[in-house]
């Protein structure tokens, strides 16, 4: 498996990552084995944006025994509430959701602490100097989060993050289901160049 340097983190990650979405829809042991199989083939980065307890527990059991072989992305603001996914910046929900993530993944740290799903410039501005962002910085200072990343689908917001000085990597989908048949816009190509050659 070929690897690449991930953003400004210095981490050497596999060119193919493991996205854990929909793991909970499959038999538990089958999903755990799939994660272990991916690791045996050289995949070393896994995204855990999903807040549902089953998905998190599956990933925890899948990386158990070889945690040091994985770079784990954990998202701040992706919470499980009323038996469904919710996106929030409310610290009364964000903190317990992150603590649950650590517990279910059976780990003391997250390699990539992700600012979860920022798709508007207004929201980007709102989280600056917020308790939400300060919490992530505090966890990075303590070593609980090794690097700070962000997920977005908006090129303007992603560019602001790339230039922020503290976001070290971006999870940015250039293919969204709603636009998968349209050509990639020039602004997206410019953003990718900025991320690869800051």
Regions found by a protein language model. Name each.
Residues 19-29, 79-95, 121-125:
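Active-site mouth loops of central-metabolism enzymes
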Residues 51, 63-92, 116-119:
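Structural motif corresponding to the early beta-alpha repeats
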Residues 100-124:
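Active-site groove signature of glycoside hydrolases
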Residues 1-74, 141:
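N-terminal binding-site loop/beta-alpha segment at the start of enzyme catalytic domains
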